[in-house]
Amino acid sequence: MCTGKCARCVGLSLITLCLVCIVANALLLVPNGETSWTNTNHLSLQVWLMGGFIGGGLMVLCPGIAAVRAGGKGCCGAGCCGNRCRMLRSVFSSAFGVLGAIYCLSVSGAGLRNGPRCLMNGEWGYHFEDTAGAYLLNRTLWDRCEAPPRVVPWNVTLFSLLVAASCLEIVLCGIQLVNATIGVFCGDCRKKQDTPH
């Protein structure tokens, strides 16, 4: 596969994953679709750190767009040198995207490990923090959270989605980093294939 076609494929995948991260993070702000918990201090710190919005979302959107542009044959920098410049930009953007995806992964992993902030026995707090993530396997503990209702499965589902998406983003940004580096030094094979004889 040519470096340009690979870049375009990776870029479109990254854009899709960053949209998944943004939506998942937005849903974490409204447990069970109820906005009444958002205005108070009843959401966990990991929700407010916006790992999915900032890290897996905006910081990965830049390399996604750069990869799509590097894979295209746009008017900006036509020819061999222009495509190599877009590939070079994609190298730096991909490194930036890896950092964003790592941020999303670390925040989401901490959110899974610590559990949600919830009301249990009349007290708000991180009641699953001391279990070191063991609450994930014991669903009977999930019902002990009185408010927000069903917050544990909500957080587990969305943080797990963010962990999976950010892992894929790290892999795809790494692939694009290598692909774009090859594209900078070797160029794009499509130029030779697409020219009429």
Curated annotation (Swiss-Prot):
Gene transcribed to yield this protein: TM4SF5
Subunit structure: Interacts with MTOR; the interaction is positively regulated by arginine and is negatively regulated by leucine. Interacts with SLC38A9. Interacts with SLC7A1; the interaction is negatively regulated by arginine. Interacts with CASTOR1; the interaction is positively regulated by leucine and is negatively regulated by arginine.
Protein known as: Transmembrane 4 L6 family member 5
Keywords: Cell cycle, Cell membrane, Glycoprotein, Lysosome, Membrane, Transmembrane, Transmembrane helix
Region (Interaction with MTOR and CASTOR1): 91-197
Subcellular location: Lysosome membrane; Cell membrane
Entry function: Acts as a lysosomal membrane arginine sensor. Forms a complex with MTOR and SLC38A9 on lysosomal membranes in an arginine-regulated manner, leading to arginine efflux which enables the activation of mTORC1 which subsequently leads to RPS6KB1 and EIF4EBP1 phosphorylations. Facilitates cell cycle G1/S phase progression and the translocation of the CDK4-CCND1 complex into the nucleus. CDKN1B and RHOA/ROCK signaling activity are involved in TM4SF5-mediated acceleration of G1/S phase progression.
Effect of residue 126 to S: Disrupts arginine-binding
Membrane topology, record value: Multi-pass membrane protein
Membrane topology (Extracellular): 31-46, 112-157
InterPro entries assigned: L6_membrane
Binding sites annotated in the UniProt record for L-arginine: 124-129
Tissue note: Intestine. Overexpressed in pancreatic cancers.
Transmembrane segments annotated in the record for this chain: 10-30, 47-67, 91-111, 158-178
Gene Ontology annotations of biological process type: regulation of G1/S transition of mitotic cell cycle
Residues of this chain annotated as glycosylated in UniProt: 138, 155
Cited PANTHER family: TRANSMEMBRANE 4 L6 FAMILY MEMBER 1-RELATED, TRANSMEMBRANE 4 L6 FAMILY MEMBER 5
Annotated effect of mutating residue 129 to A: Disrupts arginine-binding
GO cellular component: lysosomal membrane; membrane; plasma membrane
Residue spans, topological domain Cytoplasmic: 1-9, 68-90, 179-197
GO MF: arginine binding
Protein family (similarity comment): Belongs to the L6 tetraspanin family.
